[in-house]
Structures are given as C-alpha cells and as structure tokens.
C-alpha cells in the first residue's frame, strides 16, 4: 500500500502549525447553517476549539491566529491517496482468492462507501467542534479517555503498518540478493536469511533515521511510495499475460485435465477458513482517517463539501487500483496466491520483477521512520514528555525497534498482521470512532434524528465486525499452521 500513509500523518500531524482557535474556514459555505453567530453545541465552550462566527471575530482571526489553507484540490487528492495507499494492497489478491471475485467486489465496494461515509462523519464533527486534529477532537468530545483511545488506535494502526513493511523486507530482500548473486531461490545461507537481514536493515539504516530529531525529506517519501505501487500494479497486469497458470503436481488418481480445469478456473464465491481475513485486509487497506483533518486544514478555500469531493475522488481512485491489483494477481496465481503478492513473483532472469522488488524495498525502508516518528511522538505526548531529551529519545527508539523486530521475526505470514490490525485499529478508525464522536456531538440536536439513526447503525456494524471477526481470526490461528503458505 505503498501506503504509505505515513508521510502525511507525520508531517501534518506533528509538524503542521495548528492555530490555537482551531481552524475557521475561509469558505463562507461553512457558516450558512449558523444564525445569530452561534452554534448550539456544548463543545463550543472550550476556547481552544471554539469558532465564534460573528463577522468581527472572523476578521480578527484572519489577522492573528487563523491560517488559511494553501493546498489545491488536486494536490489534496494526491495527498489523501498517499495516505490511503499502503501495504494492504499486497494482500488483496489473497483476500480475493479466499472470497471469490463477486464476494470480494461486494466487500471492496462496501468498505469503500462506508469509509467515505465515516470521513463525512469526521468532517461534520470537525466543523461542529472546530478541531482539526483527530486526537484533539477525541479529547474535546470524550475528554482524556477519548484522547487515549484515538492515540491508541492510530498508534496500533501505524505499528501494524511498520510490521507489514518490515515483513516485506524480510520476505523480499533475500530474493533480491539471491537474484543479484545469480543463485537459485532454494539457495540458503545466513546472509540471505530474512530474519537476519531485517535486523541488519533495522539497526543499520532505519535506526539512524529514527534517531533524527525531525524527519526532513522523509516526510515526502509517500509520493515515491505511491509511484512504486503504481509501477507494481503495471507489472502485475503485464505478468498476467506472461505467466502461465501453475498446475500442482498430479497424483495417480487425478487426471491432468480435471486438475488444470479446477486450478485455473476463477471462482466467483468461495468460503473457507481464510475468508475471515478478507474484510480485515480490505479495512486495513483503506485506513487514512488520522490524515483527513490535517489535509482538510491545508485545503485552499476549504469547506466540508470540497473536502468530501477530495475524499470521493481519492477513494474511487484507490478502489480502481486495489481491484485491478487483486483481480490480475488472482488471475495469475489463482488459489496459489500468497498474502504477500509480490513474494509470489519469482524468476532467476526477470529484471522487471527485481526492479519492482527493489523499488518497494527502498520505499518501505524510507517509510518506516515516518510512521515510527508518529508512534514515538504519541507515546511522549501521552507521557507528557514533549521536551526533547537525547537519552530518552534514544532509549525509547531502541526499545521500540527491538520489540517490532521480535514481532516481525515471529510472525509467520502477512495475513496475520492484516487480520489483527484490520479487526482492531482499522475497525476503530473507520467505523467506531467517527460514529461515536458524531453521536456524542449531536446528542442534543433534535433536527438530526435520521442522521443519528444511520450513525448508530454504522456504529453497530463496527461492533458486529469486531465481535464476529476477532473470534474467527483467533480460531483460525488455533487450527492452522504457518505451513499453509509455505513461509
């Protein structure tokens, strides 16, 4: 994906200047619903999030505290697309293989539309409270508990993304090194062991970058990451017409024709023990919510309607890209596809695959520090240790990287990362938090009865998603072995 949702989250959430009186839109459309200069909301009382809408106050804010956005609609679409795109794209073909084409299309379409709706709820909450940062919005509505919950959800999502990126390094770097050495894929040595390589990369490259006081150019790696994934999509489509369907070895009781027909025929609806990972993987692929409000705050002539248009365009573009990657990846390998689609492409003399593999590896290595910076900053914020201290900065960085490496080494498959993060933090950020915030903010508004019913149903859907998916994922772990994918 690659998601690289990271660049925006970090540069915007951590380095963006947010005015004390959170943003007053310079688009007059934001104030058409207001009469007599007031909003009937108990959340307006706090000065840090208040928007007094009298003309004189608006003029004052423009002069001293209000900072208008400067980013065009097109660039905002690009930024939000960067925020959506991540490593989840590598797992979508596996999700399709375990649901079938029709069921996958229904799930992908549903999550896309529901994600757009959740962003609409988030924008309404931002407009009502004036908050332009997700964590501050949670604190404004639910107090310290809300702040902690949102910090926890975003940190878990970013940690899951880091795990998936380092898992890509663990999976793909050995193949790239073997190719450059002219060795077969079966070649074995300590210097092509993914577990060793991920530790070397982490402490040789990622650690020094994570120790930097600020990100600098790393905040702009998301554009490179998105380019890498567009390149990956092109290669996936191209390889579909180059790689023949792989037929497993036959035993004496099965004929070649029947096996080939069964293996190389697309399935439209499939249900098995791995189907449970489909929805969490798709949800993981669409999480971008912590970046929405910072992008909104930077949008030129911003309004809720304009930001919703940015959201609609970005999600539609990612929907097309995700579906193409999933369908062409599936039609190349059918039931043999793995949860890391890129790892399935092997070829001793295939320069094109080597190129895309190296591009993705470089992209994820440069993206991990961006996500790491956000997680570490969140921890320091929660601990109220925001003043820079080199010793604490170094110790916390090393401890977090050691823990992350231990998890990456022990995790058998990328689907496990998608499954856990998808049913927990992704579900919280897409379904539960936006609907909960909206219901709390509008609990005194009798004019929004219908909208509140839809938001309540949306919240119930998120809770149901958790209650069903979490036990099924745990059950699959208990019943399955990592040998299912040959890792």
UniProtKB/Swiss-Prot annotation:
Name the InterPro entries on file. Answer: AA_transpt_TM
Consult the record and explain the modifications the protein receives after translation. Answer: N-glycosylation plays an important role in the L-glutamine transport.
Q: Which residues cross the membrane?
A: 75-97, 113-133, 148-168, 189-211, 217-237, 276-296, 313-333, 351-371, 394-414, 417-437, 453-473
Q: Where are glycans found on this sequence? A: 251, 257
The chain residues annotated with the modification Phosphoserine are 6, 25, 28, 49, 52, 56
Q: Does the keyword Iron-sulfur apply?
A: no
User: Phosphothreonine modification sites?
Assistant: 11, 54
Disulfide bonds, paired cysteine numbers: 245-264
The molecular function GO annotations come to: alanine:sodium symporter activity; amino acid:sodium symporter activity; glycine:sodium symporter activity; L-glutamine transmembrane transporter activity; neutral L-amino acid:sodium symporter activity; proline:sodium symporter activity
The segments annotated as topological domain Extracellular are 98-112, 169-188, 238-275, 334-350, 415-416, 474-487
Activity regulation: the record says: Inhibited by alpha-(methylamino)isobutyric acid (MeAIB). Inhibited by lithium, potassium, choline ions, N-methylglucamine. The pH dependence has an allosteric effect on the transport.
- List where in the cell it is found: Cell membrane
Its recorded reaction(s) are:
L-glutamine(in) + Na(+)(in) = L-glutamine(out) + Na(+)(out); L-alanine(in) + Na(+)(in) = L-alanine(out) + Na(+)(out); L-asparagine(in) + Na(+)(in) = L-asparagine(out) + Na(+)(out); L-histidine(in) + Na(+)(in) = L-histidine(out) + Na(+)(out)
Q: Name one Pfam family in it.
A: Aa_trans
Asked whether the keyword Hydrolase is assigned, the reply is no
The residues on the Cytoplasmic side of the membrane are 1-74, 134-147, 212-216, 297-312, 372-393, 438-452
To which protein family does this belong?
Belongs to the amino acid/polyamine transporter 2 family.
Known role = Symporter that cotransports short-chain neutral amino acids and sodium ions from the extraccellular to the intracellular side of the cell membrane. The transport is elctrogenic, pH dependent and driven by the Na(+) electrochemical gradient. Participates in the astroglia-derived glutamine transport into GABAergic interneurons for neurotransmitter GABA de novo synthesis. May also contributes to amino acid transport in placental trophoblast. Regulates synaptic plasticity.
Per its record, how is this protein called by name?
Sodium-coupled neutral amino acid symporter 1
């Amino acid at each position: 994906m690659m998601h690289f949702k990271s660049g925006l989250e970090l540069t915007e959430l951590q380095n963006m200047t947010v005015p004390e009186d959170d943003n007053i839109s310079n688009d007059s459309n934001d104030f058409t619903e207001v009469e007599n200069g007031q909003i009937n909301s108990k959340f307006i009382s706090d000065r840090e999030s208040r928007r007094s809408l009298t003309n004189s106050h608006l003029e004052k804010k423009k002069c001293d505290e209000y900072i208008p956005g400067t980013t065009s609609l097109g660039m905002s679409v690009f930024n939000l697309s960067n925020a959506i795109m991540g490593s989840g794209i590598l797992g979508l073909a596996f999700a399709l293989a375990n649901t079938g084409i029709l069921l996958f299309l229904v799930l992908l379409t549903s999550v896309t539309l529901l994600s757009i709706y959740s962003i609409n709820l988030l924008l309404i909450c931002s407009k009502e409270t004036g908050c332009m940062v997700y964590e501050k919005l949670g604190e404004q509505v639910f107090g310290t508990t809300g702040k902690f919950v949102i910090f926890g959800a975003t940190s878990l999502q970013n940690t899951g993304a880091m795990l998936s990126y380092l898992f890509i390094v663990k999976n793909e770097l050995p193949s790239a090194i073997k190719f450059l050495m002219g060795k077969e894929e079966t070649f074995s040595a300590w210097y092509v062991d993914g577990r060793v390589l991920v530790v070397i990369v982490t402490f040789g490259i990622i650690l020094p970058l994570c120790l930097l006081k600020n990100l600098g150019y790393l905040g702009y790696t998301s554009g490179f990451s998105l380019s890498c994934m567009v390149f990956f999509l092109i290669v996936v489509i191209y390889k579909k017409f180059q790689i023949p369907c792989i037929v497993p070895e036959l035993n004496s009781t099965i004929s070649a024709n029947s096996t080939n027909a069964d293996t190389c025929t697309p399935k439209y609806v499939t249900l098995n023990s791995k189907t449970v990972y489909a929805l969490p993987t798709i949800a993981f692929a669409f999480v971008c919510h912590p970046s929405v409000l910072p992008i909104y705050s930077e949008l030129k002539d911003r309004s809720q309607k304009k930001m919703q248009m940015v959201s609609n365009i970005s999600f539609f573009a990612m929907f097309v890209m995700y579906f193409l990657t999933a369908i062409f990846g599936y039609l190349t390998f059918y039931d043999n596809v793995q949860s890391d689609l890129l790892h399935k492409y092997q070829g001793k003399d295939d320069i094109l695959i080597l190129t895309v593999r190296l591009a993705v590896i470089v992209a994820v290595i440069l993206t991990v520090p961006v996500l790491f910076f956000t997680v570490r900053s969140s921890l320091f914020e929660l601990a109220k240790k925001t003043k820079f201290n080199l010793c604490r900065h170094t110790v916390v960085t090393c401890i977090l990287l050691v823990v992350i490496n231990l998890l990456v080494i022990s995790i058998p498959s990328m689907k496990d990362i998608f499954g856990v993060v998808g049913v927990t933090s992704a579900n919280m950020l897409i379904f539960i938090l936006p609907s909960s915030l909206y219901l709390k903010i509008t609990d005194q508004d009798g004019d929004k009865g219908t909208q509140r019913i839809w938001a309540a149903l949306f919240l119930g859907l998120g809770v149901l998603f958790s209650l069903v998916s979490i036990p099924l994922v745990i059950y699959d772990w208990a019943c399955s072995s990592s040998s299912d994918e040959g890792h």
